[in-house]
UniProtKB/Swiss-Prot annotation:
Protein task: Probably part of a binding-protein-dependent transport system. Probably responsible for the translocation of the substrate across the membrane.
Membrane-topology annotation of the record: Multi-pass membrane protein
Molecular-function GO terms, alphabetical: transmembrane transporter activity
Protein species of origin: Methanocaldococcus jannaschii (strain ATCC 43067 / DSM 2661 / JAL-1 / JCM 10045 / NBRC 100440) (Methanococcus jannaschii)
Protein name: Putative ABC transporter permease protein MJ0877
TM annotation in the entry: 26-46, 64-84, 96-116
DNA repair as UniProt keyword: no
Entry's localization field: Cell membrane
Main location: membrane
Length: 123
């Protein structure tokens, strides 16, 4: 994957079959995404925001660093959101909030910050 990030010409020069790699990456992405959504539900914020934050934290796009940081960020976000949904944390009630409520509260400012940083960088 890292060779593909450096461009098609570089990937071809080091012996990567671009068409095959892209096909397998698309298939793998679809299968993994479908599996995760089937088990956890559509928590889109975590899946979209954590990889972007991981790249910003790592300062690189090398997958050997970004993937573990993304997994840790996703786990931390979900644990924090789960703690916030417990009774008496955000609201003083015996009811439990849906998980997407605190994710939206946490996610909106983070998404705005990411958007502003990306816009500032001109990407």
């Amino acid at each position: 994957m890292d060779a593909n990030l450096l461009g098609e010409k570089y990937a071809i020069s080091v012996g990567v079959d671009i068409k095959s790699l892209r096909m397998w990456l698309i298939i793998l992405s679809c299968v993994l995404t479908a599996t995760v959504v089937a088990f956890t539900g559509p928590i889109a914020f975590v899946g979209i925001t954590c990889p972007i934050l991981a790249r910003m934290i790592c300062g690189t796009s090398k997958h050997i660093y970004v993937i573990p940081v993304t997994m840790l960020l996703g786990a931390v976000f979900l644990v924090v959101a789960d703690i916030l949904t417990r009774p008496g944390v955000l609201i003083s009630s015996t009811n439990v909030l849906p998980l997407l409520c605190p994710l939206s509260i946490i996610g909106a400012p983070i998404a705005i910050i990411i958007y502003l940083k990306i816009r500032k960088m001109g990407i």
